[in-house]
Structure formats: C-alpha cells, structure tokens
Amino acid sequence: MVILAALCLSPLLSYGSSATSGYSEGNDSQTDGNVRLIVTTDLGGSDPDDIQSMIHLLVCSDRIDIEGLISSEAWVDDPDKTEKLRQTVEHFIEVLPTLRIHSSGYPSAEYLQSIVAQGQDKPHMDGVGEGKDSPGSDLIVDAIREDDGRPLWVAAWGGMNTVAQALHKLKSTEAEEVFRKYISRLRIYDILGQDDAGAYIAKNYPELVYIRNKEVYGWAPNDQWTKENIQNKLPLGAHYPNRIWATEGDSPSFLYVYSNGLNDPEHPEYGGWGGRFSKDRIRNIRGMDFIERSGKSETVFDDYYMIGSAPEGNQSIKRWEQSIYNDFAARMIWTQEKYYDKANHHPVAAYNGDRGRKPVYLYANPGDTVILSASGSYDPDNDDLEYFWSLYEEPSDYEGNVIFDDARGRDCQIIVPERVGDDGIHIILEVTDKGSPKLTSYRRIIIKNIK
C-alpha cells in the first residue's frame, strides 16, 4: 500500500498570538506557534552567562512570546539586581528598529520595558510565604490567570522561589477547582536546580510539568567564534560579555521553546535545540551543590519527581549545534544591517504544502510505502535550498530498518518497518538555504501504526 504525504497535524492546542502580548504579526515572522515564556534570572551575579543568554534570547524574541523577565535570587542573598536586567534590555532596545526590518514579529520597546520585574528579595524558600509577594511573583500570577489558550513556560536561570511564591498566592486565594485549572497551564524548565524551591514545587504540585536539565554544557561555541560572530556585531555585541566559566549555560531553556518546526515543547521526549528528556518522571533529581553549601537541603522534600535528561545527555543539544550557531550569527547581523536584501533569512520548511510548525502525524501499516514531500518550501531571499530527511533514532520506537530512497531530495519515500511502537517513527526534515550563514528550518513527521 502506498501512503501519500497526507497531513494530520498535532491534535494538541492550537497556539496563536495573544492580542495583548505586545507582539506584532506578519507573514515574514511566522508568529503562529510561538510559545509563552517567562524567565527568572540572577543576571548581574558573579557569572556573566545570564547576560549572554539574555542577549541571545532577546534577538530570538520574534519566535518566542516573552511575557516576563524577572530578576531573582539563587542560593545567595544578593542585593537587588533588577537594574542590571533593565540595562541589558535597554541595550537590546537600541537595535530593535533594525531587527524589525528583518522580522515583524519582534515585541515593542515599551512592551519589553513593561515586563521587567523584581522577584523575591530573599533566596530559597525563606523568600516564600504570606506577605512575601513581589512584583515578579505578581507578574507570574497574572500570566497564569490569563485565559490565553496556550501553556505558560517558566525558564529558571536562577532560583525558583518567585515561582513558588506565585503558586503560594494562587493556592491561598483561589478555590481548589480554579487553582487546579490554573496550574494545569504552567510548565517549568529549570536549569541545574539553583535553590531548594524547585524541589518544594515538585513535591507540593506533582501534576506540574517540571523539567530539570543537568546537561546544559558542552554545546556552546568557542571564544573565537563568539568574538567574530557575536561580540564584533556592534552595538549590541559590545554588551555580550566574555565567559568566566561556561558560555550560555541557561540558553537551552529558551531554545527548547524556540519555534522552528523541530520540537514540540508539550513532548519533552521528542527532543530539539533545548535538549531531549525522559518520558517518565525521575525521583529526587538533585540541584547544584551550592544549595547545601548555603545551608539548605532538598532532601526535606523527598520524594519529589521531575522530568530529567534523556540518556544521551548533552548530545541531544550538540547534534543541532551548528544550526544554533548560524541562527544566532544571522540574528546579530540583523542588528546591524538596515537593508533586508543584504542579510540572510530563514527558509520556510513545508510538508506537502503545509507551512506550519507543528508536528505532522501520519498513520500507516508495516510494509506500506510512505511518500514524503517538502513541496511548498521556499526561501524569502530566493536562495537555493538543500533538503535532508533523517530518522531521529532516540525518540523513535520500531524494529527493522528505515531507509530513505533519496534522503537529500525534495521528495522521498520510505517503507514502514515490521514493527512500529506507540512512540512512532520520528522523521526530521531539514530545509537549509545557501545564504550566509546557512539557516535551517525544520518539520517533524511522526509515523504511527493504523490502529
């Protein structure tokens, strides 16, 4: 039996842009499918990697709907660092007019200024409780209450206690049924675990989707590449600091929700630029040892369960690293280039004419021939395109062989192997232009058995 490239989009929520988000919409920006994101960050502390990640995030803000940038504590009782966060945002705002030449999806300066807030003023769970609301925790509460239709992701680059305070307030002020509805909207991506509040949240709100990534290093570019492609792109690049330890340790959290057609954030086990994660929750994933050094312990919340890294660890990010580098480099060129036609822009990867970004589900029987087509793909700069179809082995579940008859053709076909499990066969279409730097867009096709 021959299965044509029929289209069945993901049955999950249809995510659109909020009318009050401060983001504009345009065909060039492809804002459909953007994810809501709030970041809590200890930017301004001893490690400058939060500033690095913040600049990277902001130049990607046409593909992510940022709803809050919150200055938070980690394990150290630091002075308020909100002003340093505001300064970083202001440096980005300087280049916003130029960026908007290249993508209309960027937020306005006024909007970005309005979503910077101070979080808890004490670290750990010491900063959580009655009468301890902060502008940051109130911002999170308001975002959770907003009936947007999309999940709300929180990326924790520092501590989690501002999120814990928001949940404390909701639980103490809302009826149980309403509270459960609210927290069903929330998702957390925790970098390393930097205070005891993460374990508290996982213990007390076990229904929350809570990812803790301990495999955030080893994918970032070297210092020379960073200097040439990021820091030398003035004026914004001048504010991208040299590393002290690792580069951009927090970036996997927003790369996970970056809308490029590769990942589905609602399925941590699928994998993408921000890593791949376990399908089942793991018991007592410990945070950084700084928690215990500061006199706290996550063991008081045992047993708690979180979603952890998949067995391949940081390789789940490294496999995409060149495309991540090129994407960042192109965006830094956008910050300088005042003429659209003098910069490179992302191709649009289409599957059988569909130009969305959600996964495509196909249903077939063992032995069927499935015809795959990237028809409808195009490049806004009229660059030639390269196509590459590949099997994403790790999230797939099958027995037998998956062979592409023309893996580098616009169209190709495979024969469904003898057994396909419940997780299906994950095929990744990469569409790469021949501009400089080369940019890649994706589609994910998941083949499952006809039940």
Which residues are covered by each model-predicted region?
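Broad gene-expression machinery/nucleic-acid interaction feature
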Residues: H426
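Compositionally biased regions
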Residues: P11, Y15-G22, Y442
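Short, solvent-exposed loop/turn segments at the edges of extracellular beta-sandwich modules
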Residues: T432-K438
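Bacterial N-terminal signal peptides
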Residues: V2-S14
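N-terminal acidic, glycine/proline-rich low-complexity segments
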Residues: S18-V402, D411-I415, R419-D422
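C-terminal edge beta-strand
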Residues: T440-I450
